[in-house]
């Protein structure tokens, strides 16, 4: 079954998927990290793919607001997707935008020397019962 709708063998990575089936309407919902928008295959977005025909076809929706680079972030550590009543709820991790500052107390020079990319936990809600849901 093909979930993503970018060209076959495009070279773009899609990874760390999570699936949920809505028990009220039978829709199949898959959340995944997606690099199709970046020819260099580094910047990532979170995509929600939804099927209302038992998984025969999927419509893809850009779920995260802006693409991010996930280097040194904890992608996949905080991921979840659930669906009920025509609504899909998702949680995912993103690397913080450039310039985002985090302060922590480390121990010695080794702690200060480690590259650190702050990880942000995002929550998404897609309401397919509401009018106007649009795909990518």
Predicted feature residues:
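Extracellular, repeat-based ectodomains that mediate carbohydrate processing or recognition
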Residues: 1-136
């Amino acid at each position: 079954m093909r979930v993503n709708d970018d060209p076959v063998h495009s070279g773009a990575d899609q990874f760390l998927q999570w699936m949920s089936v809505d028990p009220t309407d039978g829709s199949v919902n898959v959340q995944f990290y997606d690099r199709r928008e970046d020819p260099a295959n580094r910047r990532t977005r979170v995509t929600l793919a939804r099927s209302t025909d038992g998984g025969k076809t999927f419509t893809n929706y850009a779920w995260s607001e802006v693409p991010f680079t996930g280097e040194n972030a904890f992608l996949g550590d905080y991921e979840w997707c659930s669906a009920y009543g025509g609504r899909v709820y998702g949680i995912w991790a993103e690397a913080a935008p450039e310039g985002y500052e985090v302060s922590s107390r480390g121990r010695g020079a080794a702690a200060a020397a480690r590259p650190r990319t702050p990880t942000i936990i995002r929550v998404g809600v897609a309401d397919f019962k509401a009018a106007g849901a649009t795909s990518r």
